[in-house]
Amino acid sequence: MPILATSYANPPFFYLNGHFETILPSIWRKVDGVTYEREQIETPDSDFLNLDWSKVGGKQLLLVSHGLEGDSQRHYARGLVKLFNQKEIDVLVWNNRSCGGEINRQPILYHHGSAYDLDTVVKHVLSKTSYAGIFLSGISMGGAQTLNYLGQQGKNLSPLIQRAAVYSTPVHLPSSAATLRRPTNTFYARKFMGKLKKKMEAKGKQFPGLVDLDRLPQVRNFDEFDTEFTAKLHGFKDAADFYEKASPHTRIQDIGIPTLILNAKNDPLLGEECYPVAFAKSSELLFLEMPERGGHTGFTIPSSEFNYAEYRLLEFLTQS
């Protein structure tokens, strides 16, 4: 307890495995009818964050943290926005530094452990709004940021933040990094690496001498990229040090509110340690749900506008 039974059945019949369940929704899924009002806020280090609001006059707010190289326009963000808005809940999707269409001012970017920016967003929301309750959610990397933030805050978390839910989340970052090294995951590594290299090239031009751009074409995998660039920009020794220190598995025991982790067993980007079964069994606050199917940020329901994860997060976060 609390290991939760799941009601997620099967995706469309032609979604043959976790790879199909991951890739096809990212290509095909479109969520229409979502509009944002953008607000830009300053960070304590003189950078900025773009916040995309979708307000319906709700008394509660869902705060969404997106995945690696994502933003508020990703299908998984728009799906949550549309579903929660239908239930008269306002939604705020915040864009990590350099995401959402604008390169940021400072040399640093973002990563799984950069909960300090989520803290900035939460403090801004608490100071500028009067919601009766706030829910935190995160997808993939955004889930790791959310868990890290909750663990770091512990008992100091604002009482207005009532529940949290994340899905497709690398709870154990070293394990997830090891999984990405598998030959079967070359597609994902190349996809992310292409985007990250372009962003690092832009950052290198913005700050000449900050990083060795001559090394960029030689980088072949995440370990090399995170050692050469992520670690150096953000104060870690190397990739291994980054994976360990940015991983939420070291902080989930300090989370002080009911929190759901929804990770599919066939998620191709998660390692075995990303399913904290033993801890969840002994916890009164961490709820773990592990459907057999779902892939990574997939959870497709045939003929449904929304996916299972979105319905499940709504159910968990709004239960009394």
Which sequence ranges carry the predicted segments?
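Catalytic active-site module of serine/aspartate enzymes centered on a nucleophile-bearing elbow/loop
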Residues: 292-320
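Active-site nucleophile elbow and catalytic-triad environment of alpha/beta-hydrolase enzymes
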Residues: 228-251
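Catalytic histidine neighborhood in serine/cysteine hydrolases
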Residues: 281-297
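Short, surface-exposed "cap/lid" segments of acyl-processing enzymes
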Residues: 54-105, 120, 124
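Alpha/beta-hydrolase-fold enzymes
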Residues: 127-131, 135-233
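Alpha/beta-hydrolase active-site loop
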Residues: 108-129, 148
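Short beta-strand/loop motif that positions the catalytic acidic residue
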Residues: 255, 261-263, 267
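N-terminal cap/lid segment of alpha/beta-hydrolase-fold proteins
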Residues: 15-57, 300-304
